[in-house]
């Protein structure tokens, strides 16, 4: 069992040893990563290749950091073979392929971090580098992902997309290898990321494939500068590139915003927008200076007006027609006080004058120098541009004074502005009433002042145009006020806006002529004494555009501001005026009404006049503008003038009724009412028997019937001229009414309605109110608290019917106009008395008028009412005196009201002078061209600035691009050099790898062989040891048994000379069981020794020195007993005498002689030393010379063991128990030895030493 267990243990040990000494693991595996390596590679070849790659990589990394200069030198010194060139080309091609194809998932290779700045910078590979590589520890191998590309391309580097993309930034900036980032250090298969990127950039730039933009370049530069790795880990050449590129990049940084087209701080506006802004600014400037400029121009115009008399015989004027009773009609055209035209006062006096040239009427002068005659009191003036005609336009009713000198009637600029554009050549004058009761009514002189076409052009061009030009001259352009209002809607081209510009110029002229009411009206103040005050509700202004406008004769309506007696329009057929007009060849009243309406309607239809009307309206904020009636605007102006005058006055007599024409919202208060006008009105009322309501003041009873009779008489006289007279009265009355209306809060719409009706041909409706004005004014002065509406009845139904028709026709237009008037003209009010039938429709208009009038005339109302208490005659006288100073401003206002019908305006628009049209067009074009030129100049300046800025930016961009290109070229050149150097290094590395592969294969083979030999030797040793162990076990067991059984018998043996004690025997027995130490041999001569003598070999213990060193076998030497005769050594180590043992009986049982296992000093291979080492420890009796020579031959086993002891040095110093075996199987007893029965051989007893002779 023991043998089997030992054999099993040995076999297991052998198996373990074979596993531990497996050759492949010792060659390919790292101690710490053997498992991982085995998982990646299943073949020894892959492991070997990996080992080679890693070793080569380390070598390459050691040689990595090379200075730019050293790189250049080494690169130039390196020999490049054609194969290397081919490798370079292949690497470039591969890089291009990777750049274009962009390999899908990038393969990351993790390699151990190695300092690139280690030693060994030699580029040439020598044998030492190979040895170093081969001797590098194999335990530093790390797992690397295996790429198919490596096997395919061999040693050509493969650039992966991730590496190329990541390294583009470094390439752009000139950044080189970054080994700190790096815990990814490339092997020879995948070069460093930055180098790969540089290589790619170099290749792509050489082929013109670089697509990176400047902004990306800068961003990458900044990113790379911020996130740059350790500079120590980069190549010096790449660092130099980076530094240079950064130096160039910093001064040449291109700001993307700066490269872009510079934005103008303010976008260039379009021409229309720019023009609007400019016009608004200039309008504000011009408005502040407009009043002063208008004042100066107005004064000059006045002078010019009075300069030329166009009704003079000297310039060619003549009388075209007159009433049949007239005598010496041409005398009025001659400046001679002794000549006059004579007419009886009982006849209707009229005449027609042809002026020497078409003019714009500005002033009329009339004179009667004859002492005993009646002077003209009221006369009606009509104008026309052609003759004969039935479309006489009523210029107005003029109220003269009872004087014997020239009386001037200047036309108010504002009111007459409606006619500024109308050039007329024919004037018709009708005398309506006269002062005194003389039989004859002579007329000595009549003058007409105005402005011809040429003068108009000169006035505007010299005064207004130049003044405006001076104001705007600094800006090198001029334009009319409100020019932008027309331009906003005008066409965008220059020619398209010419029309609007011309209209705007016309508006300027109108403003200049009529805008300054406050300054000039003071001198032109005149109180109209006509009883008919035209209370024009604001509404009728719009009607003329759509409906025919009758002549101003028929438009007038009567209104009493205090009495407020409703005036009903008399039909033109019934009115005597109409009949008188019919009698006249020039105009028939009924036909005049219809023709005027149609003619005016036709004229109004023309867009030209409508546009002009809009122009005039634009400047007057208090006026409701009707598109085709510019005269309405001027009526409003005249009303404002009258209001200012009334405020300036301290007291005005208001004992008069006020008639309001159905004109635009102009209110003309007539403080002095002509009795003649009132009389025909009352007369008509009585004749017609029509009931009429009028507002009256309750404070006092109506004036005495005498006043009414007087008024009636006057009205009867004036009935014939009433239609035209009513217009004039209405204007004058409106001027006077406004101050008085304030005290009278109640004003009814009837007047306004009537006024509107008046637009439709309605003869003198307002005359009724004039009849009652005197009484009412007196009553007003007494008490203002209450107002009543006394009614006066007219018995004629026709008048009521006519009013109804008129109202129906005009209600719509009235409503429209009222709205306009309410919104536009608050200050002006129309005092109208509603008829019973028409009261409701008229109330709305009247209410609005009341509010405006009350607000305007609060201050002047009280004193004016007091004056109205006076008799109408006194009022008329005051009015005359006042008109003398004021040049009959009210009369002028009344004339303007007459034009308010719209007929005059229309004709005037048509008759605008050709010069003015051309002038306006020219001015408009000049303004347009000026604005265009200015705009273009500004535009060109902006464009030039932008171009300059763009040029500067472009130059900067070019410079920066040049710098960038230069930097790129330098960088590219350096990268090319670096790439060439790297390619050379790559070629060398390839060679090294091939050499290393061969060397590694050879080493692997050698190591495998060596390991195989070691394993075989180990097996043999184990087998031999096993055999020896088995043999020893067997021999030891046998020897022990025999020896123990025989030893007690031989303990006691007789000695002839000496007896050994039991102790000595025990010692001897014990000593013999162990090998004997070598000692000096005891020489016994045969002569001295008898056979019977006993020689005792004494153990070392008997010697005190040897006794202490029982166990130190190596140091002691065994003394051999030498016989007297010399011994001959035998090859086997047995010592034999000269004579062999003859006694076969003795020692016959000893089959083998074992020598001590102790070896003396090493003397391997010599037979002498072996024989000496095998010296016997016992020697026989001296007599037996061959006592120690009778050893038997050694067996083969003993010889083999002897050889093994020689070969193994580690077994020295160990005591091996020898198995002593004899042929007999037992040791010779002492007795036998003594007797010499048996032969004792060396090694039979293990005695350490023999001490001397016994």
Curated annotation (Swiss-Prot):
One of its GO terms (cellular component) is membrane. The modification Phosphoserine is found at residue 1081. Residues 58-88, 118-270, 282-304, 530-553, 583-605, 759-788, 1152-1172 are annotated as: Disordered. GO terms for biological process: ossification; positive regulation of collagen biosynthetic process; positive regulation of osteoblast differentiation; regulation of bone remodeling. Glycans are attached at residues 202, 236, 524, 928, 955. Required for bone modeling during late embryogenesis. Regulates type I collagen synthesis in osteoblasts during their postnatal maturation. This is SUN domain-containing ossification factor. It comes from Homo sapiens (Human). The gene is SUCO.
